[in-house]
Amino acid sequence: MDCTVKWTGEGMSFLAETGSNHALIMDGAPEAGGRNLAPRPMELLLAGTGGCTAFDVVMILKKGRHAISGCEVNLKA
């Protein structure tokens, strides 16, 4: 797995490009020099943690042939 993160040259915005050919923008809070145009890097870290957890739970339940009506992970940091 790999990822490249580049500063866009504007404020505190960064472009991340993943090894699976996806891209996303990250930005900082205005008080930190950002423009609040995209999620903060730490918010994406939290979202990734929740996404990995939900992914694993759903995958395990599907492998066990359980009926799944939903899955929601709430995180706070």
For each predicted feature, which ranges?
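Extended beta-strand/beta-hairpin segments
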Residues: 1-47, 58-77
